[in-house]
UniProtKB/Swiss-Prot annotation:
This is Beta-dihydromenaquinone-9 omega-hydroxylase. InterPro entries: Cyt_P450 (IPR001128), Cyt_P450_B (IPR002397), Cyt_P450_CS (IPR017972), Cyt_P450_sf (IPR036396). GO terms for biological process: cholesterol catabolic process. PANTHER family: BIOTIN BIOSYNTHESIS CYTOCHROME P450, P450, PUTATIVE (EUROFUNG)-RELATED. Its cofactor is heme. Heme binds at residue 435. The gene is cyp128. GO terms for cellular component: cytoplasm. It is found in: Cytoplasm. It holds the Pfam family p450. Keywords: Cytoplasm, Heme, Iron, Metal-binding, Monooxygenase, Oxidoreductase. Transmembrane segments: none annotated.
Length: 489
C-alpha cells in the first residue's frame, strides 16, 4: 500500500465499540477514531504502533450528517427557544406550583430516587425546577392523565430532556404514530410472540442454571444482560454473530438524542453519528442479503417497506428502537428482580409456595422498580393541572417512578408484595405510547422468575450493588450475589 492510499475501513462488527454498561464493561469514551470517523476528518496511521485506522468514508459520514443533522439542528433550536419562551411566559404564571431542586441528572438522586419521590409526592401537584426549566408531575392520576392526553402534550419534540426529533415511534404524534404503530402491532402482539415462548423458557433455564454452577457471580453479566440480548435479537431476526454488535451500536446510536449544549453533549452527538452509520451499514447488509427472516418482526416490517408502507428510514429506526427498548430496560428489570428477592426473602418463599403468583409478582416488581423512571412531553397549548397552568411550549416531566409509588394509588407503596397485583401500573407507560414490547418483557421476566423460584432457595448480595446514573432508567450495572440451591422435598 502506498503512502497516499488509505487502508479499508474495518468491517462494521469489528470496530471499537463503547463499553456495554449492562455487562459491566467500561465505556472508554470517545476515541480519535470515533471522532474522526463521525465527523469525516481523515487521520494517519502511525507506522510504529499499528495506529488508528484512517477514516476513508467521509462521504458516508457527510451523508449521515445530512440525513440526521437537520433534526439535531432543529432540536438545538427548540431547546434554546423553549427555554427563552418558558422563562418569559412562565415567570408570571407559576401560581399554585412549588419550586423544587429535584434533578434526575444528579448521580446521587439517580442512585436512590425514592426519598426524593416522597418529597415530590408530598408537595404540590405541579413542581418546577428552574435549573432544568422543566415542570414535574409526580402523582399517579396526574401522570396517567398527561400520558393519555396526546392532543395537548406532544411527543414530537422529544421525550427526554434533550428536545429533539427523529422518526422513532415514541417521538411521534398521530397520524404518523398511528400509521407506524399499525405496522408494528401484529409482530409484537401476544399471539405472535407465543411462538417464541419455548426459546425464552429454554434461555431462562440455561442462564439461571449457569448462575447456580458459578455462584457467587454478577447477575448482570451472567443473566440480566444475556437474556434480553439473545431474546430480542432472535425475535427481531438479527441474532447470530452480529447480535452483540447490534445491541451495543444501538445504544451508541441513540446518543444522537442527547443534544445538550455542553461538551459532553457534543461528544454524545458525535458518538451517536458514528453509531448510526455503523449500525445502518450492518442492518443494510443483513436486509440486502436476505438475512432478515420473514417469520421475525423485522422480516415482516421489511416486507412492509418493500410494499411502500414504511420508508427505509422508518424501518431502520424501528430496528434501533426495538433493540434499545427490548434490551436495556428488560435487562434492568431482570437484574433488579434478583435484588428485590434478596431484600424480600419472605416473598421468594411465598412464591415457592404459590407459584401461580409469578405473573402478579412480575407486575409488582415492575411497579416497585420502574425500569423507565421518567419521560418528557411538550405542551402544545397551556395545560391545566388543578389550579396550576403550565404554559404552552413547556417541557413537562412525567415521573413514572414516583407515580408508581404514590400512596394515593397504592397502599404501602415502598413495600414489595408479590400478591399485590398492581393493575394499571405505569412501568410501561400509558395511552397510545404504551410500550409495544410489554408482552415480550413480561414473558422474559416470568420465565426468569419461574426458574429462580424452582431452583433457588435464597439470594444474598455479597457486594454493594452499582446503579446506573442514567437520568431516565433505573437499573444495575453490577450485582454480585451468592445463591443457595433449593433442595427438592
Amino acid at each position: 500500500m502506498t503512502a497516499t492510499q488509505s487502508p479499508p475501513e474495518p468491517a462494521p462488527d469489528r470496530v471499537r465499540l463503547a463499553g456495554c454498561p449492562l455487562a459491566g464493561t467500561p465505556d472508554v469514551g470517545l476515541t480519535a477514531q470515533d471522532a474522526t470517523t463521525a465527523l469525516g476528518v481523515p487521520t494517519r496511521r502511525r507506522a510504529s504502533s499499528g495506529g488508528i485506522p484512517v477514516a476513508t468514508s467521509m462521504w458516508r459520514d457527510a451523508q449521515t450528517v445530512r440525513t440526521y443533522g437537520p433534526a439535531v439542528a432543529k432540536a438545538l433550536a427548540l431547546r434554546v427557544a423553549g427555554k427563552a419562551r418558558s422563562r418569559l411566559t412562565g415567570r408570571h404564571c407559576r401560581k399554585f406550583m412549588q419550586l423544587t431542586d429535584f434533578d434526575p441528572f444528579d448521580p446521587a438522586i439517580a442512585a436512590d430516587p425514592y426519598p426524593h419521590y416522597r418529597e415530590l409526592l408530598a408537595g404540590e401537584r405541579v413542581q418546577y425546577n428552574p435549573k432544568r426549566d422543566v415542570y414535574i408531575l409526580s402523582r399517579y392520576a396526574d401522570v396517567r392523565e398527561a400520558a393519555r392526553n396526546h392532543d395537548t402534550l406532544s411527543s414530537a419534540r422529544g421525550v427526554t430532556f434533550s428536545r429533539g426529533w427523529l422518526p422513532f415511534l415514541p417521538t411521534s404524534d398521530p397520524p404518523a404514530h398511528t400509521r407506524m404503530r399499525k405496522q408494528l402491532a401484529p409482530g409484537m402482539a401476544r399471539g405472535a410472540l407465543e411462538t417464541w415462548r419455548p426459546m425464552v423458557d429454554q434461555l431462562a433455564r440455561e442462564l439461571v442454571g449457569g448462575l447456580l454452577t458459578q455462584t457467587p457471580a454478577d447477575v448482570v453479566s451472567t443473566v440480566a444482560a444475556p437474556m434480553p440480548m439473545r431474546a430480542i435479537t432472535s425475535v427481531l431476526g438479527v441474532d447470530g454473530p452480529d447480535e452483540a454488535a447490534f445491541c451495543r451500536l444501538s445504544n451508541q446510536a441513540v446518543r444522537i438524542t442527547d443534544v445538550a449544549l455542553s461538551a459532553s453533549g457534543l461528544i454524545s452527538l458525535v458518538q451517536g453519528f458514528a453509531g448510526f452509520r455503523r449500525l445502518r451499514a450492518l442492518f443494510t447488509h443483513r436486509r440486502d442479503n436476505g438475512l432478515l427472516r420473514e417469520c421475525t418482526v423485522l422480516g415482516k416490517l421489511a416486507t412492509h417497506a418493500e410494499q411502500g408502507r414504511l420508508s427505509d428510514d422508518e424501518l431502520f429506526f424501528f430496528a434501533v428502537l426495538l433493540l434499545v427498548a427490548g434490551y436495556e430496560s428488560t435487562a434492568h428489570m431482570i437484574s433488579t428482580l434478583f435484588l428485590t428477592l434478596a431484600d424480600y426473602p419472605d416473598q421468594l418463599t411465598l412464591l415457592a409456595q404459590q407459584p401461580d403468583l409469578i405473573p402478579s409478582a412480575i407486575e409488582e416488581h415492575l411497579r416497585f422498580i420502574s425500569p423507565i423512571q421518567n419521560i418528557c412531553r411538550t405542551t402544545r397549548v397551556d395545560y391545566s393541572v388543578g389550579q396550576a397552568v403550565i404554559p404552552a411550549g413547556s417541557l413537562v416531566l412525567l415521573a413514572w417512578g414516583a407515580a408508581n409509588r404514590d400512596p394515593r394509588q397504592y397502599e404501602d407503596p415502598d413495600v414489595f408484595r408479590a400478591d399485590r397485583n398492581p393493575v394499571g401500573h405505569l412501568a410501561f407507560g400509558s395511552g397510545i405510547h404504551l410500550c409495544p414490547g410489554t408482552q415480550l418483557a413480561r414473558m422474559e421476566g416470568q420465565a426468569i422468575l419461574r426458574e429462580i423460584v424452582a431452583n433457588i432457595d435464597r439470594i444474598e448480595v455479597v457486594e454493594p450493588p452499582t446503579w446506573t446514573t442514567n437520568a431516565n432508567l433505573r437499573g444495575l450495572t453490577r450485582l454480585r450475589v451468592a445463591v443457595t440451591p433449593r433442595v427438592a422435598p
